[in-house]
Every structure is written in C-alpha cells, then in structure tokens.
Amino acid sequence: NTGKKTSGNPIFPGWYADPEGIVFGDEYWIYPTLSLLYGEDEEIYKADLERQTDAINPEYNLQTHMDAFSSKDLVNWTKHPRVLHIEDVPWVKYALWAPSIIQANGKYYLFFGGNDIQNNDQYGGIGVAVSDKPEGPFKDALGKPLISQIINGAQPIDQFVYRDDDGEHRL
C-alpha cells in the first residue's frame, strides 16, 4: 500500500463500454458508450424504451446519448451528461456508440457510430460532431454519416481517429 488515494473500480457509476481516454490540456477525459440502465430511474428512459425503430436489439433504443467524464487527478471524476444526443444528429435514430475524439484547429471533433446498420439498404454509419469545448455540447458536423456503407464486409462502426507523426489526422 503506497498510501495514495485511488479512484477505485469502477471509476464512476454507470454501465459504460467502449471508453476513449484522452488528455486535453491538464485534464484527463473519458468518452464512453452508454450501454444499459444501471441504478438509474427507468422513468427518464421511458420514451426511449417505447420508441419504435428497426433496431435489431431493443436495448439499442436506450443508446440515445453520450456522457463524458473529466478529472485533473485520475481520482475525482466529473460527469458531463449528454455531451451528444441523437436530437443533435438527425440521421441517428438509435445506437449512438463507440466515441473517438480529437482536438484540431480550436475545435473538438467527436466521431461515433450510429444506427448499427447490417446492410447497405439501411441508413447509418460513422458520424462526426463538433464542439468548441471538450464537454460539449456536440452537434452533427455533416448532416449525414461520414462513412455510410459496409466496405469489405465491415460495418461502419468502432472507428478510431488519431493524429499521425506527420501531423495528419487519420480514421
């Protein structure tokens, strides 16, 4: 025992997946996918549960937003709720997930998967939203998916964006 305070496990309450960890300035940030209800009042999700979509899994109807978490010390975390919501991305109806974020040219770009398409007859794919701050709010940047087709048999989901050694951003 080092006597140092730790954040514990889990580091914040909730049921999250696909975390993207990044440092902006002197703050650590985590952008995860909201997976399932976990100790929250189901009443706040009632409308999402009752929505009719073509989701292959009804629980995808709950994935209507993304939260973010920030910390200066990796011990104490602040929740930034609903940094991105499907209301701000008109082409997404369900399954907003797998965030990846970069900072470029004074803006923050949050890439995400939307609608879990299973074939090219469905509409969805990889989107990008933009904000002036890492805590959002993020708004759809294109009005359509950046990548909307299944390519080489791969769904357009689970993207990762980074800045390469040459300074170029890659997806």
Model-predicted segments: where are they?
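Carbohydrate-active catalytic/glycan-binding domains of CAZyme proteins
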Residues: 1-171
